[in-house]
Amino acid sequence: MDIDKNKRIGLTDEQVKQSREQHGRNVLTPPQRTSLWKLYLDKYRDPIIQILLVAAFVSLILAFIEKNFMETIGIFVAVFLATTVGFYFERDAAKKFNLLTALSEEQPVKVRRNGKVMEIPRHDVVVGDVVLVEVGDEVPADGELTLCNDLQINESTLTGEPVTEKSLEGGGDGAYPRNVILRSTMVMNGRGEFVVTAVGDATEIGKVAKKSTEQTSVETPLHMQLDKLAKMISKVGSVVSVAAFFIFLIHDILTNPAWGGKDYFYMAEIVLKYFMMAVTLIVMAVPEGLPMAITLSLALNMRRMLKSNNLVRKLHACETMGAVTVICTDKTGTLTQNKMQVSVLELKQGDEALLDIAIALNSTAELNDGKPIGNPTESALLLWLDAQGKDYEELRRQVNVLKQLPFSTERKMMATLAEVDGDTYLFVKGAPEIVMKKCVIEDRMLRQTAEELDEWQHKAMRTLAFAYKKIEASIMRTSRTSTAEVVALLDANDLQLQAIAAIADPIRPDVPAAVQECRHAGIEVKVVTGDTAATALEIGKQIGVFEDEPENIGADGSLTSLDQQMITGEQWEALSDDEAYERAKDIRVMSRARPTDKQRLVAMLQQRGEVVAVTGDGTNDAPALHYAHVGLSLGSGTSVAEEASDMTLLDDSFKSIANAVMWGRSLYRNLQRFLFFQLVVNVAALLLVLGGSVIGTEMPLTVTQILWVNLIMDTFAALALASLPPSHEVMKEKPRKASDFIINKSIGFGILFCGIVFFLVMFALLVYCERRGKGGVDVHELTMFFTTFVMIQFWNLFNAKALMSHHTAFRHFLKDRGMILVLVFVLVGQWIIVTFGGEMFRTTPLSLHEWLLIIGSTSVVLWAGELWRAFRRMITKRR
């Protein structure tokens, strides 16, 4: 392969095909997955399943004594169903989480092929490709540098070295030669080009088999909170069941004369019967559906949020977004369309040809068949050149670049030292107030330029200034064109103002409404931008972040007073910590902000007890993204920002942030609904089993019946309620506190009230059946009792759906397909169990009249809920 030619034009399509066949795709082989059988068998390690298995074997002993194996078979079938259904849903959730890995391989990479710069997915990179990298990029493959401009790489993923200086020369005292660049490392400064030497598993990161995808198994704060709740309920249930076992056994020993005889089989049967009662209590008390409800909710939310352009990288972001009280957002791309166009470009001094060269050189962007690749501002300038009929690539080829000082948020400018027709020039591009300070300008031109810039900035345009100077030959003979030399040339402050430009980037049409939606939801929106005060003010006005319109913006675009709602980065830095703490709440727009200013604002807001979400697209945004409760990177942003974030906005839009808040709040609400439904069942069933034993009847609910109820309550209720779509109504509420317990007072009261009422109704039915029958409660009556209990929960599922809402439970009912499927499954499943369950479920078929009677009478649960919600609607309207 001709290396020099390859550097200039890259690979051809045929060479790409040959390289891929020879060296393979640029994909790391994922770690060996645990086999499906092992994952399935792991379900049997669940304590509740193990308790059920013990119960099944105890039941088997009883079956041999009584010569009746149907209930035992029922328990084993129920255990199999519970583990299989749980296994299926967890596998389905895992598949949804694996989307992260697949999407990370779609990360765009800039390469030179067929003489053109283009973007391709990371997995399409092949050995021999010429790859272009700049600040914030993740290196997609191993290679050798062919161009190196102040390139600094973070190699901590491989060597532990946070920053390594790179050069075109090999050697050095590092773990790898200085001209070698490696996959999964990050570009922290400068830019470079390299020829790929290894892809996929052949890379250094592939050899050490280090997992390169985002971890998703970390427990979220809510998960941990609910885990504690589940353990607490389990302990209470276990204590009650053990106490019940001993109380009833002792009571039987004291009152049953059989214990004085020698019928040991009968005694063992009594002990086993009470043991089964204790197991039934434990099974009913332990809310083993909680972990699955959370996993299922998070997985469903993650999949759906992806469809609304939110890629969740860390699970806690799903729930934390629901508690956000402040959003600190960038301007470019998030609030604007990121479709930058040069509105005005005015030449001030020098000839037009030099300005064209300055624009072409002071840029890391590229055009591929007119499609911009790279920084939007620089892309707009290249498109402007293209519209003038000038080829930026030809302009670059005509000159010899000696040194380039890349743009940084600290410097707010970029500089290139280059030879043009035998002369040496320093070309500078950057923020007008920075560049103009380094120029020699007449007062009249300074005033005129300041007025023009102010006019453009008040139209929310981004402004740039270009400057240059010709370098004396005597200076160049003694210069080594190092970074320090270029900085020294800039610090001489003797540049000539070359041109000024205004670049328009319209506000996204959906942003003002999204900002207002957030404000109505009790969320403050703060714009943190690198633009001038006047530009930032206009943006703030257009999207509606201000309480009242701020004043006192000077003609030069700077703030002439410390208006409470606006501040510059420089003024923010000058405040003491106490002053900054007080100001943080009132700030709506921070202009000319640096990354350290954004991080300090986040820190101050957090000290005030706010839950903060932050957007960022650049490498220097990483600290603020790390610091925030939720870091939101932009899909068009750098890999460094993406790695530091918790969620990625694939379309970069602020509307997606508002959607993420709605999703987070809806997720929390759905989990509250599930908890209400689950715990009402637990309270009612626990009291029923105890109550039935107190009046001396057989256990009103058998182990197999309890397992069916648990399957409904845990698995399918979790599916139904977790799959409820998000509602914009949650955006009318104030944010919850992050420290709030998920079961608030009203939900706790509802659980106890409904649980006790359901128990009293069912217990009254049990007592009625006990007293009506001469020989106790028969199987037919117990079947009606069991079906009544299930149907009460069936109707209560509607109430759970409408929990904490004034609306009818039938609102958007036909859209809730998951809910409809679960309701149909429960109804059909109950009919099958009652009709064909027989001895296995201790049931006998019911007549149509009995079914209609049970369904009609238990529906009172729903209609009572509907009346209560109608009453609340009426009260709300009167207010």
Regions found by a protein language model. Give the residues of each.
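Conserved cytosolic headpiece of P-type ATPases
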Residues: 1-735, 740-743, 756, 771, ...
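Generic alpha-helical transmembrane segments
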Residues: 713, 758-759, 783-798
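Alpha-helical transmembrane segments of multi-pass integral membrane proteins
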Residues: 749-765, 791
